[in-house]
Swiss-Prot record:
This is UPF0502 protein PA14_19450. InterPro entries: DUF480 (IPR007432), WH-like_DNA-bd_sf (IPR036388), WH_DNA-bd_sf (IPR036390). PANTHER family: UPF0502 PROTEIN YCEH. Pfam families: DUF480. Gene3D superfamilies: Winged helix-like DNA-binding domain superfamily/Winged helix DNA-binding domain (1.10.10.10). It comes from Pseudomonas aeruginosa (strain UCBPP-PA14). Belongs to the UPF0502 family. SUPFAM superfamilies: Winged helix' DNA-binding domain. It comes from the Bacteria.
Amino acid sequence: MSTEPNSPFVDDPLSAVDARILGSLVEKQATTPETYPLTLNALVLACNQKTSRDPVMNLTPGQVGQSLRQLEGRGLVRLVMGSRADRWEHTLGKGLELVAPQVALLGLLFLRGPQTLSELLTRSNRLHDFDDVEQIRHHLERLAGRGLAVHLERRAGQREERYMHLLGSQADLEAAVEAMGSDPERAAPAALSADAEARIAELETRLAALEERLARLEGGA
């Protein structure tokens, strides 16, 4: 791991649940803007998606709700009051003074852990239109300069360097690096293309929206 400035989150790190929530909000803002901001139920489903998530989680509404309140207190999410349901949106750009490309990259690192430049370029195609890996490297280095990300040197058996976010606890970060080292060239579980993963994720989100709509209709019957 290269030497970088200390993370501003070192004394009050994000939990794994916090990171999953923020990453899910960043993703859905870009991929399904018609359903964003997200209701609590939609956010739980987004956090627990089987695609584009590493690791896959099984969070409860209680866990997500508790983390949302903590994130709200830190200025990283905002509650949007609605006539039918309250919704949540991230405020990473304002809260951390980030530009859109950096928000997109942090979102991916929150959702999938350490990744190579080429992986980030492929997986970011629906979040932000990066020109090439060098543009991604530029923004990652800006994040690293503020202690929000770190460059990981290639390890034995790896073909490419990786980057990871630094907003989590030391234990979580060490576990992510250890998992990467135990399977250095791991791929997506089903070896899905980025487009296929995106389509599945969008279908899951739309299904969640339909389920919410049905629940509201049944509740009003």
